[in-house]
Amino acid sequence: MLKPRAAEGAAVALLRLLLLLLLLPPELRDRGLGVAGAAGAGLPESVIWAVNAGGEAHVDVHGIHFRKDPLEGRVGRASDYGMKLPILRSTPEDQILYQTERYNEETFGYEVPVKEEGDYVLVLKFAEVYFAQSQQKVFDVRLNGHVVVKDLDIFDRVGHSTAHDEIIPMSIRKGKLSVQGEVSTFTGKLYIEFVKGYYDNPKVCALYIMAGTVDDVPKLQPHPGLEKKEEEEEEEEYDEGSNLKRQTNKNRVQSGPRTPNPYASDNSSLMFPILVAFGVFIPTLFCLCRL
C-alpha cells in the first residue's frame, strides 16, 4: 500500500499528465490516443472498382488504384487530346485522370460486379478539353436503367479544361438497388451507361465505385468562377407585393460533398481524455480517502 505522501504525489502527477493531454492540439492528441483522425483514411480499401477511361493504370494522391481501361480495343475510342492542356481543380499528380477519356458514337458503358450489400457511391470524372462553348456535347448517364445524370453539359457546368465530378450515392439491400429515389431489382452487377444524345458523343474520363457515403468522397479543389455563379443563383429576391425574402435554389448536382465542420470533430475528440481523467481520478481519490 502506498504511503499518504506517495499516493498524493502520484495523484498530482496523474492530474498534470491529463491536463497536458487536454492542452495538446487535437491532431497530436488524437494521434497519441490512437484515434482515427485524417479524413480519407482507409479510402483505397473502400474502393471496389476504378478505371482510368482511355488511359493507363494510375494511383491517385488518395491511394486509389485506377486500372487500365478494360474497354480498350473493344468499345469506343480512347483520346489523349487533353494531354495538351493543364486541368483546373485537379492536383498536378492526378490531371492525367481528366486528360484522357473514352468516347463512343453510340451509347456505351461499363459492367461492375458487386458482391456485398451496403451503401455505395459512384464517382464519375469529366473535363471538357475540346469544345469551347456549351450545347456542343450533352448526354445522360444511366445506372442500371436509372437516369442518374440528365443532360450533362460539362462546359456549361465548369468551363473548358476544368475537372468536374458527378457523385451518385446508392444502396444495395435485399436484392434491390435504390438510387435517387428509385428502386429496381439488383442481380449482382452495376451497369454504368453513357447515353448518346443530340449533341456530339458521350464520354467519360475516369470513374470509380466505393463503399460508403458522399461524405467519404474526396472533393475537387475550389473553382472561383463556379462559386461566384452559384452565389449569384442563390441571391435573395423580393416578392413585389409582400417584400418577403425567398431564395432561388437550382437543382444542380454538386461536384463534391460539403466541407466538414472541423469544430464538430474537435468537440468529440475532447470528450475522450475528459472521461479518462474522471475514470482514473475517482479511484485514486477513493484510495487516498482510505489512507
UniProtKB/Swiss-Prot annotation:
Binding site for a carbohydrate: 81, 103, 130-131, 200
Transmembrane segments: 269-289
Organism superkingdom: Eukaryota
Membrane-side (Cytoplasmic) residue stretches: 290-291
UniProt KW Membrane keyword: yes
Compositionally biased residues, Polar residues: 244-264
Biased composition range(s): Acidic residues: 230-240
GO MF annotations, alphabetized: carbohydrate binding; enzyme binding
Keyword Signal: yes
Region (Disordered): 220-264
InterPro entries: Malectin_dom (IPR021720), MLEC (IPR039155)
Keyword tags: Carbohydrate metabolism, Endoplasmic reticulum, Glycoprotein, Membrane, Signal, Transmembrane, Transmembrane helix
Topology, Lumenal side: 31-268
Localization in the cell: Endoplasmic reticulum membrane
Membrane topology: Single-pass type I membrane protein
Membership in a protein family: Belongs to the malectin family.
Assembly mode: Interacts with the oligosaccharyltransferase (OST) complex.
Protein name as annotated: Malectin
